[in-house]
Amino acid sequence: MTAPLIVICGATATGKSGLALKLAEKLDAVILSADSRQIYKEFDIGTAKPTPAEQQSIPHYLIDICEPTETLTLAEYQAQAQALIAQFHAEQKPVLLVGGTGLYIKAITKGLKIPRVAPQPDLRQQFTDLGQAYSYQLLRQVDPEVCQKIHPNDQVRTLRALEVFYVTGEPISSQQGENSPTYSILEIGLDCAPDHLDQRIRQRTQQMVDQGFVAEVERLGKKYGWDLPLLNTLGYAEFRDYVRGQGTLEEAIANTVLHTRQFAKRQRTWFRANPDIHWLDNTAPDLLEQALNLITQQ
């Protein structure tokens, strides 16, 4: 029996999308993206977004649902994902939730209770003008508990926590909880030895360049302005600097590889803390068969 929801998770460059495409074909399933950057239109190469051909062969959802200048809250993502899951469950269609954004996945698998506070552009701009360091220190004063879960450089989550506090008068940490779904969930995680993952990260970064990533960054910067928050995210920030004459292409590649390795380590730590995940070695020649066995055992 196929689980109503199958999660494919893990660090970046572990082959989640590749496995998901094969599983979807075998199971006649749909794919829901759990990637906080693939939701944005035009940010394609740097987010390793499924190609148009892949999206045409297998139905994909929660990709290209926002303009680059828009903000999608975790609550909004959760609501859209839950609605799609309910729709496909009613149609008895298997659903694959695929990605490396741990909070997106947890919002679905654990049914996180999330404050329904709409984005506050003016308030966010005020905090942005004050700078990330100051904003984070302010958050530490009003909600020290949530600061334990937010990196000092994570501007998006810092601003979200601050706006929730200033709109509701209560820390976001006191408004969060869990309400787990009633349907069954199978979580499959992909992992491999660190040296193999390093090699995959290097290969992916070079592939991004070969696919035209420099041109993508240049086009986005000219269209939306170089201070667009998305251009300050992994990969885009390093190549933005190169496009603007700060450093060489080789340095942009090296910095992207380094920062991606660091990011992958944080992702791995997050997912490894979840005891519900069934881990598979992505180098196994029978990876697809192992995954299918887990699914049919549910």
UniProtKB/Swiss-Prot annotation:
ATP binds at residues 10-17. Its EC number is 2.5.1.75. It comes from the Bacteria. The keyword Transmembrane does not apply. Keywords: ATP-binding, Magnesium, Nucleotide-binding, Transferase, tRNA processing. Its cofactor is Mg(2+). It is an enzyme of class 2 (transferase). One of its GO terms (biological process) is tRNA modification. Residues 35-38 are annotated as: Interaction with substrate tRNA. SUPFAM superfamilies: P-loop containing nucleoside triphosphate hydrolases. It catalyses: adenosine(37) in tRNA + dimethylallyl diphosphate = N(6)-dimethylallyladenosine(37) in tRNA + diphosphate. The keyword Nucleotide-binding applies. One of its GO terms (molecular function) is tRNA dimethylallyltransferase activity. Belongs to the IPP transferase family. Monomer. Catalyzes the transfer of a dimethylallyl group onto the adenine at position 37 in tRNAs that read codons beginning with uridine, leading to the formation of N6-(dimethylallyl)adenosine (i(6)A). NCBIfam families: miaA (TIGR00174). This is tRNA dimethylallyltransferase. The gene is miaA.
